[in-house]
């Protein structure tokens, strides 16, 4: 479960406490530059010790060293370059980093993510690397205007997830995460097999605007 972005202002502080104390999970989608900087500083300071921390959002290859080994799961691997960079950093640290492949299931130009065909290639690569563990797939479809709008996209993701798990994964038990669905469509996502949803707006209302620097 995710608020869609923690650390984005005082209005989101209750969510961070809620996930830390009740769920034991903090999931970040650092869409704003200042939020990314604050998150990086908190990770380096090990401020979330004891919580399960997930990273959602674009991860630059030059920032991999600030995230690998400091979060439990990276949701947004979408290129060979990034996957190999994560593997190299995990190798340096002597650990295995859990990752999800981000799939741009609707082919939206404004969003990151690989194509479904590229997901097959990245999944095969992940199986050959020693210091990453592929846990599943992640997708962020278009904003749903009404119930059922995103069911076709969720169905595509479920099939892709099952096919990759059955045909590529060396250990199918490792492939246990299908991260998709937000406040407007999480019920449809769960109906299609989602294991992780991001419902911060449904729980706590709209995110307050970022203060201008």
Segments from the language model and where they lie:
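Catalytic lobes of large eukaryotic enzymes
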Residues: 1-4, 18-23, 35
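Active-site loop ensemble at the mouth of alpha/beta enzyme cores that anchors a bound cofactor
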Residues: 210-213
């Amino acid at each position: 479960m995710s608020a869609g972005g923690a650390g984005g202002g005082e209005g989101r502080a209750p969510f961070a406490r809620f996930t830390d104390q009740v769920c034991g999970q903090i999931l970040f989608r650092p869409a704003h530059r200042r939020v990314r900087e604050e998150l990086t500083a908190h990770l380096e300071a090990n401020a979330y010790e004891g919580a399960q921390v997930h990273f959602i959002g674009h991860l630059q290859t030059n920032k991999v060293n600030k995230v690998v080994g400091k979060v439990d799961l990276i949701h947004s691997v979408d290129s060979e370059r990034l996957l190999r960079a994560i593997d190299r950093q995990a190798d340096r640290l002597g650990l295995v980093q859990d990752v999800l492949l981000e799939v741009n299931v609707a082919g939206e130009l404004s969003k990151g993510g690989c194509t479904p065909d590229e997901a097959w290639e990245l999944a095969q690569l992940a199986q050959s690397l020693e210091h990453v563990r592929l846990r599943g797939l992640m997708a962020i479809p278009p904003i749903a205007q009404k119930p059922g709008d995103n069911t076709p996209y969720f169905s595509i993701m479920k099939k892709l997830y099952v096919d990759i798990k059955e045909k590529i994964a060396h250990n199918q038990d490792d492939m246990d995460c299908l991260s998709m669905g937000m406040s407007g469509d999480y019920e449809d996502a769960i109906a299609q097999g989602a294991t992780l949803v991001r419902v911060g707006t449904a729980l706590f209302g709209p995110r307050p605007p970022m203060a201008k620097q």
